[in-house]
Amino acid sequence: MSDFLTIAIPKGRILEESVALFGKIGIHCDELLSNTRKLIFENREQRMRYMIVRATDVPTYVEYGCADLGIVGKDTLMEQEKDLYEPLDLKFGYCRMMVAEPAGLARDDDPSSWSNIRIATKYPNVTEKYFAKKGVQVEIIKLYGSIELAPLVGLSERIVDLVSTGETLRQNGLVEVETIAEITTRLIVNRASLKTKHPRITEIIEGLEKHV
């Protein structure tokens, strides 16, 4: 099986867009979209293997060589800082990582005057580094979901989270005050695999480049 290429892909919209994109370069993996609990799929004819994993686990599987390639959001890569090769921006899954706060607070707030603030987020590493560069002391509360709830119940004054349309923020009375980064989906590669399977991986990268 060492001649197989293994790709780690998360479920959801990224999976659907990834299957469509790979189809454009002749790598057909439509079976990944079937209603099944299978987590590993193989295409022996094309010598490809696919692993369905949690988005936050994709970099780990690639870093340790369980997968040669992975598809994952830039937000996850920024937070985890794994030792990976990141050759390609796939240009889908666009959103923004931003700082938000209640609209009432924002009316009289000046981000340049922040000195000691409390923030709830799924991204403690990114948040800490961002505010350290600004010279702002920050207490970070790590949450795993429904980040918008934190300011509403007094857990934090502000949040750092991903926003696509901003509708969830608006419905919860929050507004964006600063953008930390623009996020898209990336192709990542295990560094050892890039050497041992260089021709096949390079062919995939160059093929995908023509369609993004």
From Swiss-Prot:
Keywords: Amino-acid biosynthesis, ATP-binding, Cytoplasm, Glycosyltransferase, Histidine biosynthesis, Nucleotide-binding, Transferase. Pathway: Amino-acid biosynthesis; L-histidine biosynthesis; L-histidine from 5-phospho-alpha-D-ribose 1-diphosphate: step 1/9. It comes from the Bacteria. CDD domains: PBP2_HisGs. GO terms for molecular function: ATP binding; ATP phosphoribosyltransferase activity. It is an enzyme of class 2 (transferase). One of its GO terms (cellular component) is cytoplasm. GO terms for biological process: L-histidine biosynthetic process. It is found in: Cytoplasm. This is ATP phosphoribosyltransferase. The gene is hisG.
